[in-house]
């Protein structure tokens, strides 16, 4: 940060209520993925303090399947993931 300030540059790191506001980043991610992943209702942290959401899928996915779906749906050239033998049903969103 000091180097940015010394060079008269600013940095914006937006991990704020913009993630959880109605119609904002998490909502857009959920809307893009809910049909493809058969997502149920979204839930936030129990005490309301977190910026992430979770949703249960009506289906199970392997890590490879989920990465492929995310890559295509979000238009990402690369999606990094860790292989696992456990099926994935709970999806976390944090814009």
Q: Residues of each region from the PLM?
A:
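Hydrophobic structural segments
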Residues: 1-95
């Amino acid at each position: 940060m000091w180097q940015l300030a010394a060079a008269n540059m600013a940095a914006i790191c937006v991990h704020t209520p913009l993630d959880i506001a109605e119609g904002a980043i998490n909502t857009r991610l959920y809307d893009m993925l809910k049909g493809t992943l058969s997502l149920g209702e979204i839930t936030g942290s129990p005490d309301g303090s977190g910026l992430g959401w979770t949703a249960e899928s009506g289906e199970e996915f392997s890590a490879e399947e989920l990465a492929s779906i995310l890559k295509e749906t979000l238009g990402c050239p690369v999606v990094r993931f860790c292989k696992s033998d456990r099926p994935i049903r709970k999806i976390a969103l944090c814009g």
